[in-house]
Swiss-Prot record:
Gene symbol of the encoding locus: PROK2
Source organism of this protein record: Homo sapiens
Function: May function as an output molecule from the suprachiasmatic nucleus (SCN) that transmits behavioral circadian rhythm. May also function locally within the SCN to synchronize output. Potently contracts gastrointestinal (GI) smooth muscle.
Cysteine disulfide partners in this protein: 34-46, 40-58, 45-107, 68-115, 109-125
Signal peptide: 1-27
Effect ascribed to mutating residue 73 to C: In HH4; phenotype consistent with Kallmann syndrome; impaired calcium mobilization
Domain of life (superkingdom): Eukaryota
Impact upon substituting residue 24 to P: In HH4; phenotype consistent with Kallmann syndrome
Stated induction or repression of this protein's expression: Activated by CLOCK and BMAL1 heterodimers and light; inhibited by period genes (PER1, PER2 and PER3) and cryptochrome genes (CRY1 and CRY2).
Protein name: Prokineticin-2
Family, per entry: Belongs to the AVIT (prokineticin) family.
């Protein structure tokens, strides 16, 4: 008998979510999906999505004042091998298009800007000196 008096309450709790759920077949469409920088337009790069890590999307390059991510986090302790690697890396282009797979959700800064540290763990696109 008790279960019969709870039935209307249960129906009131379950009915609104059923009415608000989308019909079968509705899905999100992700525009701007990419695999490489060359698939994105000018001023954009192919970066990891902030919401779904397995998807890469065309993302605008950093403008003045935008937060950014440094190209490397490795410490340089000054031994010869690391110095040679650093010189070799500095010769490589660090611009868009990048032919590898980006591992972060931000793009490099626009040309003429650099990703500079402003506090312990914060980097911002600022004018190069």
């Amino acid at each position: 008998m008790r279960s019969l008096c709870c039935a209307p309450l249960l129906l009131l709790l379950l009915l609104p979510p059923l009415l608000l759920t989308p019909r079968a077949g509705d899905a999100a469409v992700i525009t701007g999906a990419c695999d490489k920088d060359s698939q994105c337009g000018g001023g954009m790069c192919c970066a990891v999505s902030i919401w779904v890590k397995s998807i890469r999307i065309c993302t605008p390059m950093g403008k003045l004042g935008d937060s950014c991510h440094p190209l490397t986090r490795k410490n340089n302790f000054g031994n010869g091998r690391q110095e040679r690697r650093k010189r070799k890396r500095s010769k490589r282009k660090k611009e868009v298009p990048f032919f590898g797979r980006r591992m972060h959700h931000t793009c490099p800064c626009l040309p003429g800007l650099a990703c500079l540290r402003t506090s312990f763990n914060r980097f911002i696109c600022l004018a190069q000196k």
